[in-house]
Amino acid sequence: MPAPPLVLASASPRRDEMLRLVGVRFAILHGNVDEAPRAGEAPEHYALRLSEAKARAVAAMRPGHWVLGADTIVTIDGELLGKPATRDEARCMIRKLSGREHTVITAFTLFNSEQAKVIRQAVASKVRFKEIPDDELEWYVATDEPYDKAGGYAVQGKASFLVSEIHGSYTNVVGLPLCEVVEALKELGLVSFRGK
C-alpha cells in the first residue's frame, strides 16, 4: 500500500521550493492559527506549538494525510522578533541585529490525524550580521523584502550581504531544516531516494 500523501501546511514559497528541490512530492494547504505568543513562553516551545497547531489545523481538513507544519522565529536578547508590519519596525529590527549574533529557530511537526505518531523537532542556528551602515540599512528596508519574514530579513534574498556568519543549518535559517525534515519523511516512508 503506498504511503499516504504529504501536505505542506504553509504558504511559504521558500519551504515549497526547498522540498521540491530534493524531490519530495506534496500538496499545499494552509489553515489559520493564532500566532500570538503566550506570556512567558520559551522561544523553542512557541515555535513547536505553532508548527503543531498549523499541522493539526490542516490535518483536520485532510484526514489520513501526513501534514508538515513549520514555524520560524528569530530571537535576540530573549526578545522574539516577528514579521515587521511597517518600515519603521523593519528598520528597528535590522538595526537591533546589526553587528550581533541572533538565533533562528525553525520547528516542524509531522502529524496524521489517523496515526498515533507525531514527529516534532526544533532546530536552532546562530546568525551574525555585519555592522550595517545607515545607507545599507535604508536601502534594504526600502526593498520591501522584510515584511513577510521573521526578524525582517531573508538570508537567501537581498539581505544575504548583511550576513557575516552562520553556525548551524542554512536551510533552517531560510525556513525549513531540510536535513532533519527529510530524515523524518524517510522514517515515515514519505520519501525515498532508492531507484531515483
Which residues make up each language-model segment?
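Cofactor-binding loop segments of dinucleotide-utilizing enzymes, especially the Rossmann-like FAD-
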Residues: 11, 31, 113
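N-terminal beta1-alpha1 ligand-phosphate binding loop
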Residues: 2-24
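Short glycine-rich, Thr/Ser-proximal phosphate-binding strand/loop in the N-terminal lobe
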Residues: 23-40, 118-124
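Anionic-ligand binding patches
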Residues: 2-7, 41-196
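Short loop/helix-cap segments at secondary-structure boundaries that form the rim of catalytic
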Residues: 17-21, 38-39, 60-61
